[in-house]
Amino acid sequence: AAALSLKDARKRNFYLGFYLNRDTVVDGCGQLSLPTASKLWFTPDGHWKEPGGYHNYPVSKLIEAALMLENNGYQIFNQYPILLKASYVMLKYSFPDLTASAFGDTGRPRQSMECLESAILMADKYQLPILPDLLDAAIILERAGQYDRSKSGLTGLLCYLPELPKAKSGDDHLWNRSEKLDFASCYLQRNGIDSQDGLMCVVQGATYNHNHSNGMSMELYGAGTVQGIDPGN
């Protein structure tokens, strides 16, 4: 935001370069630019390469910066579609109660509504076919009592669509029957997404960043409850 406010174009481009194209890592310390972070730190479907409890914070900060640039003429989401995928990927690995797997060393995370609203905004802007599925997800989360759009505050007022478009996919594209999170070799099987009648199983245990907490483990979902690993927060 500070860089975008600079009137001197040379200075503005210099500071924006640290986000857009310039890495500053020396001896393991520094900052990665968006192109490098997108290449190294995201799975092909947009999951941050750490357990789900770590996903929302770094992704939300990258998206906040991307939205500022989008509002100033930079087509960041068009150039880096992985950011859009990262905005809603937690839904893909969610149980029917809309909590996600607790693999690794964090508690059980949820889809960030701020990120989902950003995904809806950009999918609407670029008229992407994923938009109806994202709108369906927002409605499901509202009906489940996990989101009240009227209380989104200044962020909602300044950054979200004034109203959600009327669209319905009629399909559950975000909740496939089988999924694999590649970097963690985490596998899931899903039978329905109804919070009471849906069933789901998650199995994982490969060696990866932050997997010192669980070892080989399994999570089972049924009758509205997840049974299995819970490493805490």
Region spans (language model):
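Active-site lining segments of carbohydrate-active enzymes
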Residues: 1-53, 57, 63-66, 157-174
